[in-house]
């Protein structure tokens, strides 16, 4: 359900969801809007933002600003895929992602697809279990991507060479 794709400088921005929410007061209802966005540089940096405002464009702008301030770096494989299979959890949402061979594409649904596209991952198999709430899926996906370790990081931690790790 990705709506808008915009490029500013080297960042790719995607709007994942816009939601109308209401607050009931003595005089009736007050409506406001929430927006969920992801921002990435297609080279391993990704961030998400959640903005709330009385009007849709303002909510989207707030979400984009928060996403740009909330960016993290992901260690990608040279083939445009993941280093290894990973799992991520956030509240009721669980995600599982595994590397895929060249030409597979992004096999993922909804909010997870948008996160993977802006991160720069080109080949991946992914599945969401449990809650498919977009906010929780985005948080679980970024949580999983942050857990990913490169062979260099694992080799340094174990005190071995990269060749020994990749065997």
Curated annotation (Swiss-Prot):
Keyword GTP-binding: no
Cellular component annotations (GO), alphabetically ordered: small ribosomal subunit
Pfam families in the cross-refs: Ribosomal_S5, Ribosomal_S5_C
Protein name: Small ribosomal subunit protein uS5
InterPro entries according to UniProt: Ribosomal_Su5_D2-typ_SF (IPR020568), Ribosomal_uS5 (IPR000851), Ribosomal_uS5_bac-type (IPR005712), Ribosomal_uS5_C (IPR005324), Ribosomal_uS5_N (IPR013810), Ribosomal_uS5_N_CS (IPR018192), Ribsml_uS5_D2-typ_fold_subgr (IPR014721)
Superkingdom of this protein's organism: Bacteria
Disulfide bonds: none
Organism phylogeny: Bacteria, Pseudomonadati, Pseudomonadota, Gammaproteobacteria, Candidatus Palibaumannia
Purpose: With S4 and S12 plays an important role in translational accuracy. Located at the back of the 30S subunit body where it stabilizes the conformation of the head with respect to the body.
Family assignment from sequence similarity: Belongs to the universal ribosomal protein uS5 family.
Domain named S5 DRBM: residues: 11-74
Organism, scientific name: Baumannia cicadellinicola subsp. Homalodisca coagulata
Signal peptide extent: none
Summary of subunit composition and partner proteins: Part of the 30S ribosomal subunit. Contacts proteins S4 and S8.
Gene3D superfamilies: 3.30.160.20, 3.30.230.10
UniProt entry keywords in alphabetical sequence: Ribonucleoprotein, Ribosomal protein, RNA-binding, rRNA-binding
Comment text on domains: The N-terminal domain interacts with the head of the 30S subunit; the C-terminal domain interacts with the body and contacts protein S4. The interaction surface between S4 and S5 is involved in control of translational fidelity.
GO molecular function: rRNA binding; structural constituent of ribosome
Biological process, per Gene Ontology: translation
